[in-house]
């Protein structure tokens, strides 16, 4: 007999950074145990118990090693009803409690950008032309985009401009044609057979006023707002649903697009919770973790109507930075709040900034204003000792 998915559950969320998932689960009324590589202040507040993983995600296998050790300890204490494997370990095999993820083989396969490109082509979906390094000659002209075959966030994505540069590229990488357009995504909830697109989102990529460089992911604005593009956005949401259904995914999933002049082109499929979660929940009022949980019982939500615009911007350090105070003293509209005493090197994410507004411009202006207040406070912190700064 299945347990009711709407009763409070004891949920373990573990991964490289899990604040967004854990906070959503907590807002849904569940009892959350969380472990990641940061243990940010708001993660500690959202969870009944939190743990800082002893892992360096840059070392292959280290995050999985630490996560397995923690899961084993938690399972032995019989503390959880289910677990969510978050960023960095979504395709890991775990035992001892129900795993609320796509099957590891499915996650691994779909996260392979080269495999996905071939599948999209075979299935007839318009997508960004993608090839292996060896087949890059099939693509049209320069510049081209080179990115890791697996992975997210855009940190290692780069452009190449000549055949000589291309000849010097090696490793487990893919090459894509550069396509002009708006970076976008569709958030989908699925039960393995059917899917519901719950929002279309604008992606902030390489946003300079957030300190983002290159093609780095810097956040989202929900809903995607493009005048005279309503029909195209509706088409994009339908495509997102169809892809998710054909791949037989379950739970919360995301499909990345480039909204080009020719129409929406599929870029990637993310078979996991996405960074757009905060913006989607602010805009729609729905709880994505609860929708994710219910989908494993075959219950799907109706598509919510946006109440307004929700935004999340990831602020990156413009220089080496010491965090000497709780940044919530500057504005409560922050998430992924670092601990006082922690350090951020140039280019590291510092904090997420949130906003909402009836108009997109309002939400963006609020992000910019809060970003300015945080930066001014951080500049004061850099020139003062911890005792000199009053919170």
Regions found by a protein language model. Give the residues of each.
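Short acidic-glycine loop/turn motifs at beta-strand connectors
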Residues: 190-195, 259-263, 317-319, 357-358
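A conserved helix-loop-beta module that forms one wall/lid of the active-site cleft
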Residues: 100-165
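ATP-dependent carboxylate/phosphate-activation module, predominantly the ATP-grasp catalytic core
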Residues: 180, 184-248, 270-296, 304-305
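ATP-grasp fold ATP-binding core
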Residues: 120, 130, 140-157, 171-187, ...
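A short glycine-rich, hydrophobically flanked beta-strand micro-motif that places a catalytic Asp/Glu
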Residues: 249-261, 304, 386-391
